[in-house]
A protein has these predicted regions:
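Conserved pre-motif I regulatory segment
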Residues: 152-185
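Generic recognition of stable, solvent-exposed alpha-helical segments in well-folded globular domains
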Residues: 25, 87-90, 129, 133-140, ...
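Metal-dependent nuclease catalytic regions and adjoining charged, substrate-binding loops involved
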Residues: 97-165
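A broad, structural surface signal
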Residues: 28, 93, 97, 143, ...
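Metal-dependent nuclease catalytic cores that hydrolyze phosphodiester bonds in DNA/RNA
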Residues: 1-65, 90
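Conserved catalytic cores of phosphodiester-cleaving nucleases, focusing on short active-site segments
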Residues: 27, 55-81, 95
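Alpha-helix N-cap/helix-initiation motif
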Residues: 80-85, 173
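Metal-dependent nuclease catalytic cores in nucleic-acid-processing enzymes
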Residues: 28-34, 83-112
Length: 185
């Protein structure tokens, strides 16, 4: 999603950012605050055409049918660029479709849980989504990725074919090149 959902500003920094260790601690803290039936770090996978998509959602509550995508931050959440929030929703909704598919659900709540590392306060943003909406979102992003991947493959094949047709400009080493090449190799 981070690739196919990018738009707008290329500067995705949201500073100051938590360290990796703070992020892991924050995720554990958020999971510990949930109810007894809450499942955390759930592996999900799905297929779109010949593309296999795998990921791990931060957690979900089967009783309330809510998927949580936890994001840790420092400072003011209001300073977070809209572009970054868009990426977070894209990721969470892909996980939402994979979870609906896995559990056989026709809808669920998708939540972005922003945890301020400093204050340990959560800001929770929730969207109710039908499985159909999530599937359309998933297929749109997978389709974009496959289009890009196909273009990359075509470019590489054309490049490699052109490189095979090239001839080196000189038939033999020039004076001093062979000993230099041997010394380097």
């Amino acid at each position: 999603c981070e690739f196919t959902a990018k738009h707008g500003d290329l500067d995705l920094r949201f500073t100051p950012a938590p360290t990796a260790q703070e992020g892991m601690t924050g995720h554990a803290m958020a999971a510990a605050r949930r109810g007894a039936g809450y499942r955390s770090e759930v592996a999900l996978s799905g297929q779109y055409q010949n593309l296999r998509v795998r990921g791990r959602c931060d957690g979900f509550d089967p009783a309330s049918r809510r998927l949580d995508e936890v994001k840790t931050f420092k400072g003011s959440l209001e300073r977070q660029p809209a572009v970054q929030r868009h990426l977070h929703w894209a990721q969470a909704k892909v996980y939402g479709w994979l979870l609906c598919q896995q559990e056989g659900w026709n809808a669920l709540d998708v939540a972005l849980v922003y945890l301020d590392i400093g204050s340990q306060q959560e800001t929770v943003l929730v969207e109710h989504c039908s499985a159909q909406q999530l599937q359309e979102h998933f297929e749109q992003h997978c389709g974009r990725f496959l289009l890009w991947a196909g273009q990359q493959l075509a470019h590489r094949m054309a490049r490699d074919t052109a490189l095979q047709a090239l001839t080196f400009p000189f038939g033999d080493f020039r004076a001093g090149q062979r000993p230099l090449a041997e010394a380097v190799y």
